[in-house]
């Protein structure tokens, strides 16, 4: 976060038996097993999310973790480090889309624990094929193009597994940017339900 954004993060003061204790709002929510994945998916952000997932597993391996996503997407390798950790750890990771989950954000949303993937009513979800850019010698460009196709196949297979859609449907629907409303994301199988109100 930038210094300006750091200054804008609210602090929460708690009374304890030893006096007052103050936390930034994200640290306080981490105590409630809530992690925020916001903005571009990149290596630094992915490392922070992975560290929080591992920490919460060590705190209580049997209690669900809640991952709130508002992301336009980003790096496939950074996203896969988060995805693999979500699948690896013992606690179920419940995913919640607020705002948008596009590209790798949508993939991580779908990768939450089955039956525990949610979207807020006015959020949007977008899936597409991975993007890549490379310049250099023709032979190196060919190597990188083949790697992008391999990654595309892997992501499509995993998305088919998490959504229950046939692979050929995933391949067709990710060929171009494919935007979905909250209800369409439920119908497609990326999430399990639209959350409009917190339960009583």
From Swiss-Prot:
GO terms for biological process: protein quality control for misfolded or incompletely synthesized proteins. It is found in: Cytoplasm. Gene3D superfamilies: 2-enoyl-CoA Hydratase, Chain A, domain 1. Fourteen ClpP subunits assemble into 2 heptameric rings which stack back to back to give a disk-like structure with a central cavity, resembling the structure of eukaryotic proteasomes. PANTHER family: ATP-DEPENDENT CLP PROTEASE PROTEOLYTIC SUBUNIT. Cleaves peptides in various proteins in a process that requires ATP hydrolysis. Has a chymotrypsin-like activity. Plays a major role in the degradation of misfolded proteins. This is ATP-dependent Clp protease proteolytic subunit. It comes from Vibrio parahaemolyticus serotype O3:K6 (strain RIMD 2210633). The gene is clpP.
